[in-house]
Every structure is written in structure tokens, then in C-alpha cells.
């Protein structure tokens, strides 16, 4: 699992989003750059008496509200939002990797059972051919076995293609190149008891990545509502300037005057009070609140449904093992003893062995279904997921 968390390209992109949000947050909420103002005028085009003036000034805009603080707050929450998105993607990635691994493990065991079925039916076909030569069996029975054998071999080919697709998906999740082989070494383990499955509530819910993601969006919406109200007042402008003027004064002629001044520009919210943005932000805040409630209900219901399905499937698998599996194993033991005593022929032994393999396959499907439900439950509750130590992955470059 560590390989997937390290190499998966989607997670790399999510981590880059955090870096981007952090960089934006570092410089958010700063004053606008000051403006340098230069001016020059003369009477050259009119009286041409040599009169002129020069002006240089600096203007800086300052907010009259807490707009900059709100901008810094929104930017900081956006970092939390990016981190929650990363954790949520990690949760889903772990689910997908475990699901793919579980599927491949199940397909491997299913293939092993089918290989056993092929060997059994091939031996049975040889047995029937010998009996046909002795006139003790019909070719109809042999044809039925050969048709069944062909069907099993076709199923093996379908399983192989399905396994190849699952391996390709797993390779992508692990961030591996196409030339790297991935092999599932451990077999599917049957549970002896269900893990403790607590309801998703309280702190567990609040720490869920998807809940935190939506909660961060709600927090941003609240801050943006406050920001919209703060934007009713535009920034005031403060100007500091120096002016020099040369003008004609009778009767002394050209004279020079210098001025130093301060100017203030105060915008008045008489026409545009940002009411549209204020109303929109209020509705957006309400919308995110509804979405947060919807996420809360969905997460709780999904966790509860998966918990009930896990309990029902576990009881079904345990009952199936107790009844059908135990019964067919006893039948197999009895038929072998009967064959050793000469009470039945080898054909009956083959048929019971085939039934035994079919029952084992059905039992395998139940355990696979249960394991998949548990994987979904751990992802739905964002529980601490086990690593793949029980399903070792070995990979090597061809």
C-alpha cells in the first residue's frame, strides 16, 4: 500500500494542489501595490511665458473593513480543503487497491479450483474410455464429460482475461509502468470472526476525509459571506505628493512656488453596495450547509448498510460451511471408503469429487463477497486500513 500512496500519479497531483494552495496562502491578504503619480504642465501652447509645473506623488489604498484578514482566512481554509481532498483520495485509493488485490486473490483461487476440475474430468474421461472399450459404458456419458470439460476450460480463459484486466488496473493504481509484473503471493484468508464494526458517528464522522472536505467548503462559504459584506466599502486612497510651480508674477517676472500635500479619496457606497454578491454568498452558504447534511446522512447510512450486509454474509458463509461444505466432505470420505470396499464404481467417486469442488467454489465466492464488503466498509468509515502485508505484492521489471 505504501507503494501506491507514494507512486500514484493522482495523489501526486493532489499534493501539488496543496503546495499551490500553500503558496497562495502565504501571499494572501496583502495591500495593493502603491501607485507612483507623475505630472507636468506648461503654457507653451498658449501664452508661452515659461510657466510650468511638476508633480510627483504616491498613492496607497487601504481597506476600511477587515477584508484583508478575511482573505487570509479564506486562503488558509483552502489549504485545509486541499489537504482534506488529498486524504479523501488516499482513502479511495486504498479501497481500490485492496479491492483489486482481493479480486485477483479470489480469481487465483477460483483458477486453482477450475484446474482441479479439469484434472478430475480428464481422469474421468480416461476412465469412461476404458469402460467403453469393455462395453460397460456409453459414449453419451463420455460426450457429456467432454462438453463439461470444454466449458470449464472456457471459463478458465475468461478468468485469465479478467485477471489480466484486474492486474492492469492494480498496476495503474500502484503507479507502475506496463512492463512491471505484479503478483499476489498470499491466498485469500477465511475470517474466523467479524471485526468490531462501530457506527460512524461523533468524532469518527468529523474526522472522515469526505466530511472534512465538505466542512471546509462550508467554512469557506461562511468566510466568503463575510467577505462579500466587507466589500460593500471600497478601499480608501491616501496620496502624498510634492508639487513645484513656476509662474509669472508682475512686476517681478517668473517665480517659483513649492507645495507638499496629502490627499484622501473616500468612495461612498451610494449606488453599488455589493448586494448581489452578498445575497448570492448567503444562498451559497445555505447550499453548502445542505450538502454537508447530505454527506453526513449518506456516510452514516452507507456504513450501516455495509455493516448489516457484512453480518448477513458472514452468517450465510458460516452456515454454508457448517451444512453444505461439511456434508459434501463427509460424502467424499464415505464414497472413498465405499469404493475401497467395492460397493461403488469409480464413476461415483468422480461425481462426488466434482460436487466437492463446486461446493468449495461457492464457498470461495461467499468469502470473497464478505471480504469485499469489509473493504467497502473500512473505506466508508475511513477506518485504519490494514496494509498489504497479508497479501504480499512482489514486482520486478522484465
Map each language-model feature to its residues.
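Periplasmic alpha-helical coiled-coil/stalk elements that build and connect Gram-negative outer-membrane
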Residues: 84-207, 306-309, 313, 356
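Transmembrane beta-barrel architecture of outer-membrane proteins
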Residues: 53, 99, 144, 235, ...
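Outer-membrane beta-barrel domain signature
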Residues: 48, 53-54, 143, 157, ...
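Short, charged, amphipathic alpha-helical segments
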Residues: 73-76, 139-148, 346-354
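Residues on the lipid-exposed face of transmembrane beta-strands in outer-membrane beta-barrel proteins
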Residues: 56-60, 170, 262-266
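Bacterial Sec-pathway N-terminal export signals of envelope proteins
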Residues: 1-40, 62, 70, 136-138, ...
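Amphipathic alpha-helical coiled-coil segments
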Residues: 13-25, 89, 93-114, 123, ...
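Small/polar (Gly/Ser/Thr/Ala-rich) solvent-exposed segments
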Residues: 12, 31-51, 61-88, 212, ...
Amino acid at each position: 500500500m505504501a507503494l501506491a500512496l507514494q507512486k500514484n500519479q493522482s495523489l501526486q497531483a493532489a499534493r501539488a494542489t496543496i503546495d499551490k494552495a500553500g503558496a497562495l496562502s502565504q501571499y494572501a491578504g496583502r495591500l495593493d501595490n502603491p501607485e507612483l503619480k507623475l505630472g507636468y504642465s506648461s503654457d507653451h501652447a498658449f501664452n508661452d511665458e515659461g510657466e510650468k509645473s511638476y508633480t510627483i506623488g504616491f498613492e496607497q489604498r487601504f481597506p476600511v473593513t477587515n477584508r484583508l484578514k478575511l482573505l487570509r482566512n479564506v486562503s488558509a481554509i483552502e489549504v485545509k480543503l486541499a489537504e482534506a481532498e488529498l486524504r479523501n483520495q488516499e482513502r479511495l485509493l486504498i479501497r481500490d487497491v485492496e479491492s483489486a488485490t482481493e479480486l485477483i486473490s479470489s480469481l487465483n483461487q477460483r483458477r486453482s479450483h477450475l484446474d482441479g476440475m479439469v484434472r478430475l474430468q480428464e481422469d474421468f474421461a480416461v476412465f469412461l474410455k476404458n469402460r467403453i472399450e469393455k462395453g460397460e459404458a456409453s459414449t453419451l456419458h463420455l460426450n457429456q464429460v467432454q462438453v463439461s470439460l470444454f466449458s470449464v476450460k472456457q471459463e478458465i480463459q475468461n478468468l485469465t482475461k479478467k485477471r489480466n484486466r484486474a492486474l492492469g488496473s492494480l498496476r495503474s493504481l500502484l503507479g507502475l509502468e506496463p512492463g512491471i509484473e505484479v503478483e499476489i503471493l498470499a491466498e485469500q484468508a477465511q475470517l474466523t470472526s467479524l471485526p468490531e464494526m462501530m457506527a460512524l458517528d461523533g468524532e469518527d464522522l468529523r474526522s472522515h476525509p469526505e466530511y472534512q472536505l465538505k466542512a471546509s467548503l462550508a467554512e469557506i462559504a461562511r468566510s466568503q459571506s463575510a467577505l462579500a459584506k466587507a466589500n460593500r466599502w471600497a478601499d480608501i486612497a491616501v496620496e502624498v505628493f510634492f508639487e513645484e510651480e513656476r509662474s509669472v508674477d508682475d512686476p517681478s517676472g517668473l517665480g517659483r512656488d513649492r507645495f507638499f500635500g496629502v490627499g484622501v479619496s473616500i468612495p461612498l457606497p451610494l449606488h453599488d453596495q455589493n448586494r448581489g454578491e452578498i445575497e448570492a454568498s448567503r444562498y451559497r452558504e445555505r447550499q453548502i450547509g445542505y450538502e454537508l447534511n447530505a454527506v453526513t446522512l449518506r456516510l452514516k447510512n452507507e456504513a450501516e448498510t455495509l455493516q448489516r450486509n457484512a453480518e448477513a454474509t458472514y452468517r450465510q458463509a458460516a452456515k454454508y460451511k457448517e451444512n453444505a461444505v461439511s456434508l459434501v466432505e463427509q460424502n467424499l470420505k464415505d464414497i472413498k471408503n465405499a469404493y475401497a470396499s467395492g460397493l461403488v464404481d469409480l464413476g461415483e467417486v468422480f461425481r462426488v469429487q466434482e460436487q466437492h469442488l463446486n461446493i468449495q467454489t461457492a464457498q470461495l465466492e461467499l468469502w470473497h463477497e464478505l471480504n469485499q464488503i469489509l473493504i467497502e466498509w473500512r473505506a466508508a468509515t475511513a477506518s485504519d486500513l490494514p496494509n498489504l502485508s497479508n497479501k504480499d505484492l512482489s514486482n520486478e521489471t522484465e
